[in-house]
Amino acid sequence: MLIRFKINEIECEVDEEKEDLTILQACTANGIEIPRFCYHEKLTIAGNCRMCLVYVTNEEKLLAACGIPLDENFDDESIETEIDEILKAREGVMEFLLINHPLDCPICDQGGECDLQEQTIAYGLDTGRFYIKKRAVEVKAFGRLIKGIMTRCIHCTRCVRFLTEIAGVNELGVLGRGYNMEIGTYKKNVIIESELSGNIIDLCPVGALTSAVYAYKGRPWELKNIKGIDIFDTVLTPINYQVKGGEIFRILPRINDRLNEEWITDKVRFHYESYKIIEKMRKDTPSYKIQANKFIELSWKTALKMVFKVLLNKKNKVDLIIGSKINSTNLRIYKELMNRLGSKNYITENGLLFKKFNYDFRENYINSNDLYNVDQNDLVLLCGINLRVESPLLNIKLRNINFGDDEIETRKKIGIIGNKFDWKQESEYLGSTVNSMLKVFEGRFPYCQQIKKSKAPLILVGSSLLSRIAISLQEIRAAFEIASNIKPENVLLITQGANFGMALEEGIFKENFSKGGNVLYSIDSNEYKVSKTINYIIYQGILNDTFENKIDLYLPSKHYFEDFESDREIYVNTFGQRSEIEKLRISKGNKIKENSMIGYIQLMYLNKKEMNRKEKEQKEIKITYRGIKQKEKRQVKINKNLTINNIIDNYYMTDINSRLSKNLMITGQLRKEKKIMEAGSWKNKTCI
C-alpha cells in the first residue's frame, strides 16, 4: 500500500510493503533532521531520550518519532517537526539532560564529537534554572580499554543494547530508577568480556565512555584520516587511522554495510600503541650476529652482498616464509626471486597451517558468499572454527540470525564441531574430534536430518579442522554435496591472515611444506617454530620476538602500510572484495627499506620497469572458467580420534603488534584468568 503524507508541508510517499519505516527514518530519508540521542539504526528502539518528539495531526500529544511506524493510519496525515510546541519541548528535554551533567567540556575527550554539545547549542536554553546539588556517580571500571566517567551519562542505553543484542554479552545494564538510575555492571568491578567492547565508545553520544588509551592525547580536528584495513582478520574490515605528526593517535571504523557495518574489533582499535614501542626497540640498520647475543651493524651494501652469498650458494637449500601482512606486489617479487634461484620451497605464514590445499580454482579459496544476506540462511554448521576469536565480526553477523521464536527448533538449526565456545546458547554440540565430522558426512547425527531439510544452509570450515587432517576444502564440499546435497558455494572457508587468498592467487603455497632446508629466509614472519635443520636465518622485517636470538642476519623493513611504492595498495579479503589502503609513514629511521625495494635489489637483472610491465599484463588478462564439479572418490587415512583444537589460544596476543600492546596484553590476561579490575584502575595506568 502506498502511503502519502506531509512532513513540514512537503509531500512524501512510502510503499508500506517495500519499506518498513518509522517517522524518524522517513524524515531522515527526505532530508529533514530530527535530533536524537538514544536512537541508532543498528540497535533496537528504546525511546529513552525524547529528543525526537514530533507533532502529528489528530494526535493529542507529541510523539517520539523513533518508535512510531508509518502505516495506513498516516495516509493523508501531516507531520510537523519545527513548530513552537516542539521546540519548547526540546528545550525542556535538554534542560533535564543537562541537570546533572558536569562542566567537563574543556578536558573531555569527546570534545568536538559530542552530540550533547552540538544539540545543546541548537536546541537548548541559554540559561540554567537548576540550583540544587548535582548528582555525582562513581567512576566505573570497565577494563584497561574503556574509561567510564558515568557522571556524564545521559542514560541513552546504547551501550547496553549493543552489548546485549549484537556482542552477545549481558554485563552492562540499567541499575536503580529515577534519581538513582545508573548504567553499570551487575557485579561490581567486572570487565566487559567481549572482543567488540570498544564499539560502545563510538556509540556513546557524550563523554561517559571514552578510550582509555587515547585519553588526553589529542583533539579530533587536529587528526588526519588515512584509510586502512583490519589486518588481523580475513574480512579486512575498513578502518581509519587518525594520525598527527607521523604518530597514530586513534583507529576508528569506516562504515561498510556489506562487511562490518560500523563495528571493529578491540584488537585493531587498540593495538596501535605497539608501533611506538616497536620504533624504540628496532634497529634501523642491518645487523649480523658474530656470536651469541652479539650483533654488529652493517651497511646495506654489505648486508645484501651477504644475502646474495647465502642464497646463491648451491649447497644451501632455502626455505622462504612470508608474513601474513605482506601485500600482493611483494608476494610476486619474492616468488620471482625464489624461482630465479631455482627453488619452489616458499609459503606464507598462514599457509603453514594447511597440510593440503587445492588452489587450481579461485572458488576453492575465495568465498562467493559475502554473508551480507546471512539472514536468509536457515541453518548454520561450524566445523573447526571458533568465531569469537577467529573472526569476531562474522560472529556477530551469524549469532543474530533469527530462526524463529521456537527455542527448541532454533537449537536444531545451529551445530558446532570442535572446541566449545560461548557463541549462542541455543546450539547443538556435535563433538570435538575428527570422528564427529565423519559422522556428519555419514548422516549419523539427528542434526544431519536438519541439514538435509535445509533450503539455505551455511557451513563454515575453519583452519583448525584443515590443519588436523590432510583433506582439502574441495573434498569437504564434495562430501557435503554427496551426503546432504549442499551446494559448494554454501561451504565457506574462514582462514587466518590478511594475504592468504592473495598468496594462493600468486601460486605461493607448497603442500606438506617440510621446512627441510638449512637456510630460512623470513619476510616479516615469526609466528612459527624454526625447524631443527635450519643453521642460518635471514630475518627481514620489523621486529622478531619469537626467535630473535637465533637470527644470523637482520634486514630492517617497513610496516605493511608503508611498504608500497604508490600512495595506495589493494588487498583482497576472503570474499574476493577489494579493500584499499593509503600509505601511512611512521618509521623514524631513514635507513629502513621497503620490502619491495630489498626484493628489487636482489633481482639484480630484473629492473622495475619489467616487473611493472608484467604486473600490468597480469591485471589486464581476464580468465573465465567454471569449477569442475567432480565428486572424487579416494581413500584417505585419517586418525578419527584427533581433537580439533582451536588454533588461537589468546585472542589478544596473536602477533607482535598485539603482544607489544600493553593494554591488549593485560586485557587478554585478565579475561583469561578472569580477574577483577579495581575501580578507577585506568587512572593508574600508563598509556604508552
Swiss-Prot record:
SMART domains, sorted? NADH-G_4Fe-4S_3 (SM00929)
Whether Secreted counts among this entry's keywords is no
Which GO biological process annotations does it have? ATP synthesis coupled electron transport
Q: Which InterPro entries does this chain map to? A: 2Fe-2S_ferredoxin-like_sf (IPR036010), 2Fe-2S_ferredoxin-type (IPR001041), Mopterin_OxRdtase (IPR006656), Mopterin_OxRdtase_4Fe-4S_dom (IPR006963), NADH_UbQ_OxRdtase_75kDa_su_CS (IPR000283), NADH_UbQ_OxRdtase_ferredoxin (IPR054351), NADH_UbQ_OxRdtase_Gsu (IPR010228), NADH_UbQ_OxRdtase_Gsu_4Fe4S-bd (IPR019574)
Per the record, its GO cellular-component terms are: mitochondrial inner membrane
A single Gene Ontology molecular function, please?
metal ion binding
Tell me which residues make up the 2Fe-2S ferredoxin-type domain: 1-85
In this chain, [4Fe-4S] cluster 2 is annotated as bound at: C153, C156, C159, C204
Q: Taking every annotated instance into account, which residue ranges of this chain make up the domain 4Fe-4S Mo/W bis-MGD-type? A: 223-279
What protein is this chain from? NADH-ubiquinone oxidoreductase 75 kDa subunit
